[in-house]
Amino acid sequence: MLELPGARACAGALAGALLLLLFVLVVRQLLRQRRPAGFPPGPPRLPFVGNICSLALSADLPHVYMRKQSRVYGEIFSLDLGGISTVVLNGYDVVKECLVHQSEIFADRPCLPLFMKMTKMGGLLNSRYGRGWIDHRRLAVNSFHYFGSGQKSFESKILEETWSLIDAIETYKGGPFDLKQLITNAVSNITNLILFGERFTYEDTDFQHMIELFSENVELAASAPVFLYNAFPWIGILPFGKHQRLFRNADVVYDFLSRLIEKAAVNRKPHLPHHFVDAYLDEMDQGQNDPLSTFSKENLIFSVGELIIAGTETTTNVLRWAILFMALYPNIQGQVHKEIDLIVGHNRRPSWEYKCKMPYTEAVLHEVLRFCNIVPLGIFHATSEDAVVRGYSIPKGTTVITNLYSVHFDEKYWKDPDMFYPERFLDSNGYFTKKEALIPFSLGRRHCLGEQLARMEMFLFFTSLLQQFHLHFPHELVPNLKPRLGMTLQPQPYLICAERR
């Protein structure tokens, strides 16, 4: 069969074009991986993938790996995440210096392909620093105050939910069970009251499925394949992989949230909001003639989803760790029981006003927050303009990781940080003392807007459960204490026995 000269020439030209394109891509990637002048030092990196492999193959969890690297390269060091120049901040002093003293510069979010794909850099948590974020944050803060922790009556709603949780636990009659789903349902219902003005029953399988997809995505987002997607977004064309599972989950959640929002808005009366969705729709109406307004149906869905996962995943895991440690350390549990019996008694419900009279219980919860590091690397920041920190030059648009684990295990501020020791939060007279270097809700302009509500939930759920139950592991079977890797650190699945006191 004869091959036409024109066909050979065409094939040759195509091959040459592909080689040229490959060469351009290689050069572009290598240029992206160059460390700028004055940039913080860091470990050696591989071509193209940078430090992704060393992170993924390390025997340590990422936050532990980063802390170890800081001992070699300093409290401020750099990583190359496949061409994404990243600065890691370690220790309380440098984190405070950046997030507080240079708060506006470090208040941005990185334009990572994952965030672009999931939320188009809209919504609330992952939006860029600017008017859109400021407007959404203002609305969320006001909503959490007016429809949540700012209302005295809202405490009674939390207590009602604690009793629904206690009733559900009692059905196991002291036998072993996994409390993850029950606590997740209870905690998420507090956020649901603020967002939608209603709670969901523990038998609502549709809502439970959505929360499970959220939780799965929190784990997937921290996986090596998703880091590779951020570095090389073209792998998104592959029909398989963890990134595709994450996107499928997100699509299901998006559709479900859209239906929830439509249902919540059925009885809406403009300018008389009863929950966050009402208030957001009012903002949409007011912004119809403002071309700069970022309030939209899409951003409403993104914001609601982010508030649900932020309000549920963190508080749920704090309580799961707290209960695990009560069973692990019966002497500590006994002291909490003693304080609850003394201050609250058996016949009264716990109340937020008792918190200041219960220093040991407060100390236990704060030690759980410190020791367990629910969000060890925070949410990634980015620089909104060029910055100089301790003599290092950090260009605009650099991804910044705040290693909160390194803060909470900083020997400068914590004696024997590897020990679970609630007494570190008590003074010589037994009074509770705050510690400056405890920042589980982060610092600066992007600190957690639901901190007050989260603290109220933790205290009321924890004291209510400990008032009613003695907690222990079945057959003294101690669970694996190594946390599951994700954007948050949650305990491995474990069984607990809750016997009526």
Curated annotation (Swiss-Prot):
One family name in Pfam for this protein: p450
Binding site for heme: 448
Catalytic activity: calciol + reduced [NADPH--hemoprotein reductase] + O2 = calcidiol + oxidized [NADPH--hemoprotein reductase] + H2O + H(+); vitamin D2 + reduced [NADPH--hemoprotein reductase] + O2 = 25-hydroxyvitamin D2 + oxidized [NADPH--hemoprotein reductase] + H2O + H(+); 1alpha-hydroxyvitamin D2 + reduced [NADPH--hemoprotein reductase] + O2 = 1alpha,25-dihydroxyvitamin D2 + oxidized [NADPH--hemoprotein reductase] + H2O + H(+); alfacalcidol + reduced [NADPH--hemoprotein reductase] + O2 = calcitriol + oxidized [NADPH--hemoprotein reductase] + H2O + H(+)
Disulphide bonds in the chain: none
Associated pathway: Hormone biosynthesis; vitamin D biosynthesis
Membrane topology per record: Peripheral membrane protein
SUPFAM superfamilies: Cytochrome P450
Gene3D superfamilies per the UniProt record, alphabetical: Cytochrome P450
Main location: endoplasmic reticulum
Tissues showing expression: Highly expressed in the liver and testis.
Keywords assigned: Endoplasmic reticulum, Heme, Iron, Lipid metabolism, Membrane, Metal-binding, Microsome, Monooxygenase, Oxidoreductase
Superkingdom, natural source: Eukaryota
Positions bound to substrate: 250
MF-aspect GO terms: D3 vitamins binding; heme binding; iron ion binding; oxidoreductase activity, acting on paired donors, with incorporation or reduction of molecular oxygen; protein homodimerization activity; vitamin D3 25-hydroxylase activity
Disruption phenotype: Mutant mice are born at the expected Mendelian rate and have normal development. They display substantial reduction of serum calcidiol levels.
Cofactors required: heme
GO cellular component assignments: endoplasmic reticulum membrane
Record family assignment: Belongs to the cytochrome P450 family.
Protein name per Swiss-Prot or TrEMBL: Vitamin D 25-hydroxylase
Organism: Mus musculus (Mouse)
Lineage: Eukaryota, Metazoa, Chordata, Craniata, Vertebrata
Gene this chain is encoded by: Cyp2r1
